[in-house]
Amino acid sequence: MEPLHAACTDAELIVTLANGQKVVTPLWWYPRLLHATPQQRAKYELSPFGVHWPDIDEDLSIEGMLVGSKAPGANQPEPS
């Protein structure tokens, strides 16, 4: 489950794995990423098992994303 690329939209985190699979999670699951600037989100480091954003000190494992682990303080936004 090695990540090859990570990207954020306004609503989702998308991580592409070495096997071609894409893991997509709601961005609100990770408040640090949700509130980060586009530049901070674009600056990430890959490891064999996850993604690290050094400017906001956020580390996410692929396994955690797959099982639906949300960061502490994650609150689903109200529908608009």
Please identify what each model-predicted range represents:
Residues 1-80:
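Motif-centric detector for short Cys/His coordination patterns
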